Amino acid sequence: MAFMRSKPSLGSLARVAFRWCGPGVGLVNYSQEPYLVKAVQGKSKPRSPTLQSAMQPRAQAETIQAPKCFGEDSFFFSSTPKADVMGVADGVGGWRDRGIDAGRFSRDLMQRCFVHAQKPTFDGRNPRQLLSECYGEMKRKWKPILGSSTACVVAFNRSESALYTANLGDSGYVVIRNGSVLDRSEEQTHFFNMPFQLTVPPPDSNREMWFCDDPSEAVATRLLLQPDDLVLVATDGLFDNMPEQMLLEMLSKVQGVHEQKAIQEAVNRVVERAGALSINPIYKSPFCLRALENNVAYGGGGKPDDITVVLASVAMRQCNTVGDSNESKGSDLRPRLSFP
């Protein structure tokens, strides 16, 4: 089956010109390499009705790469010569009833993902393995951090111009091309409002009491990207409150825009809107509609929750390399591959 592209692939743009530099020097390729222009925004949910005014957004500039958090959500993004990596994690709030900081687990998970993504050997091709290694480290700690978290990590491999994804639970990603959804993650739940989650339970407890899902259960995909594509990674606080069409409309003005300021302003607007909808008592939110579909009593309105959104635009930049280069080996692969 053939797939038509509306634009040339990034791989086909990789080598645009070269010149001879004399004996012993070889060819200098004047090429364009793909990269992601990123911005992040988030809001912590009000912990009581009187704290709604505390839902103030805090923008994070692209230069800030170390993990940050919004309430019990956490995120990171990383850029190396091989890959741009972005991730979000949503700490499971039920641990608060046991006197445990529900956000500490997600923060530790994203911190470890950030450290691994910064390694020179990590090329972004296996974010599911990255999750597995980090989760394994957390379980092996002498005094492990107890808790649970969903996780979504996406990595853009520059040499292939391909986005590799790993999603466990109800956080997720959306890829937008020409104003339409090209690909979107599917949430994983045991039942309504009970997502798959990575868990470190108390050592003296019965493991069967907990939902202890494994990183191997994360859905992994590969998707070829083109210039101007948008990649959004977010926790369920966004998806539970903002329908897909509204999201597309809000991001339509930055399709093809590569200025970091514009990307930041766009993600600010998305989070601000989602936050307002989450505390609207008469709004028919996606969460409310799914509750009705599952015969779950819900009073209606939005779903107050922490909201974290990372938005990126695929751009090109000039780079000079010495030596003969080959076009992307992945340029003739299917646009989307799922790994079992």
Swiss-Prot record:
Family membership noted in the UniProt record: Belongs to the PP2C family.
Q: What is its EC number?
A: 3.1.3.16
Checking InterPro entries in the record gives:
PPM-type-like_dom_sf, PPM-type_phosphatase-like_dom, PPTC7
Q: Which reaction does it catalyse?
A: O-phospho-L-seryl-[protein] + H2O = L-seryl-[protein] + phosphate; O-phospho-L-threonyl-[protein] + H2O = L-threonyl-[protein] + phosphate
Q: Please give the organism.
A: Drosophila pseudoobscura pseudoobscura (Fruit fly)
**This protein's name:** Protein phosphatase PTC7 homolog fig
Which keywords belong to this entry?
Answer: Hydrolase, Magnesium, Manganese, Metal-binding, Protein phosphatase
Q: Which domain of life is it from?
A: Eukaryota
